[in-house]
Amino acid sequence: MAGVKKNRSPRKPTKLLQSRLKFAHSSATLKKCTECQMSYIIDSPADCAEHKKYHDLHLYGKKWLASWGTAIQDTCSSQYITPPSTSGGNASGNGAKADREDYIVYITPGKTAEVKAMMEIMYIVNNELTAPHDENDFWSEEGTSSMGRAFVYIKDGRAVGAITVEYLKEDDSRGRWMRVSTRELVPEVVPRVRLGISRIWVCRKQRGQGIATRLLECVRKYAILGNEVARWEMAWSQPSESGGKLATRYNSVRHKSGELLIPCYI
């Protein structure tokens, strides 16, 4: 029996679809702020908000609550340490911190709020110096008060300067002399140093007003309770270019050869 041949309808041609890839607009590019040096995407609200916060802290310092930190007091007169501009006859050691224009506080390890506030400052500091972000244990962790301290300079309700220092043991032999001219360490000479300046910073708009020197003097007199140290006993940790200039002004010594030396530690 012959098979029946079925008529087939002509096949419709397959409709092809073209895929399109969407790329981000070219306008979503990085912009680098000329003042704070932060790079951010100008079309990103989150990036812009982060830049605004970073920019404000970098230029003007961090807004500081009066409850953060313990004000340093002169052990003889019981007066707060203040710059000459605010330490006249109207300055009283019994006044509240919030009523004072300028004062210096130290950070207590274990007090979460003030340690966190100081950490925000250190984030800026380490970014500026291209320094490691994991060198805060000696001043921030509870039970480490014998290892170092952090101090903050407060002006008009903002933290405009900060310094962190390590306590150095003479037996550790960490002191060195650094030649100012070449930034090379002098071999086989180990000076006696007692304090290591790990970081020092002043916000951009307050630089050139002596705040860094006041912080250094505070550390020199009060970092070791009841024991003032000499300037040359304060050593620097790999000072930056600006830090090297500060160190040269503050505690460099002139060798008999005529060369200037800065105390450093390793």
Curated annotation (Swiss-Prot):
Signal peptide: none annotated. One of its GO terms (molecular function) is zinc ion binding. GO terms for cellular component: chromatin; nuclear replication fork; nucleus. PROSITE patterns: GNAT (PS51186). InterPro entries: AcTrfase_ESCO_Znf_dom, Acyl_CoA_acyltransferase, ESCO_Acetyltransf_dom, GNAT_dom. The keyword Cell cycle applies. It is found in: Nucleus. Coiled coil: none annotated. GO terms for biological process: chromatin looping; DNA replication; double-strand break repair; establishment of meiotic sister chromatid cohesion; establishment of mitotic sister chromatid cohesion; mitotic chromosome condensation; mitotic sister chromatid cohesion; regulation of mitotic nuclear division. Gene3D superfamilies: 3.40.630.30. A zinc finger (CCHH-type) spans 31-55. Keywords: Acyltransferase, Cell cycle, Metal-binding, Nucleus, Transferase, Zinc, Zinc-finger. It holds the Pfam family Acetyltransf_13. Residues 108-266 form the N-acetyltransferase domain. It is an enzyme of class 2 (transferase). Its EC number is 2.3.1.-. Its main location: nucleus. Belongs to the acetyltransferase family. ECO subfamily. Probable acetyltransferase required for the establishment of sister chromatid cohesion and couple the processes of cohesion and DNA replication to ensure that only sister chromatids become paired together. In contrast to the structural cohesins, the deposition and establishment factors are required only during S phase. Acts by acetylating the cohesin complex component SMC3. This is N-acetyltransferase ECO1. The lineage of its organism: Eukaryota, Fungi, Dikarya, Ascomycota, Saccharomycotina.
